[in-house]
Amino acid sequence: SYVRTQRDLSLYGIKTFFCSNVCAAYKKEIYQELGGFVRKTIFNEDMIYAGKLIQMGYGIAYAADAKVIHSHNYSCMQQFHRNFDLGVSQAEHPEIFAGVPSEGEGIKLVKKTINYLIQKRKIWMIPGVILQSGCKYAGYLSGKNYRKLPRKMILWCTMNREYWNV
């Protein structure tokens, strides 16, 4: 268990304000004081809010003994679409994400997963991890650069088509 604050940014980067709504609890008074979640975002409202908390001098606590069961079983294309939206959210909120790249965290996760599969003698699963990770990264990179894409391409890439109905 730990509490992360602004002081941790140089050491942990984007992991300083990693947050997932499915596993989060918020102090109501602070949530209201800071205006809650951003009103319009394609994805990542939890991390945007957590980044705002850090910027305003608050901390984010992680409770190691908390129990949450949550999972996804996304296909490669679903991973692409989801991570496209993640990239869009980071591109649209540089006030939170500029200066804290997340690519390094993804690479660490891939390496850790591959090492785990090797240790467990499940080497046949490694190509799937690489394929899934490639789809995630391609989606993320496309999302970060969505402003350079034609609208038709954006609508094909996104998981949240309704977001683009302006």
Segments the model singles out, each with a brief description of its role:
Residues 1:
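Conserved catalytic core of nucleotide-sugar-dependent glycosyltransferases
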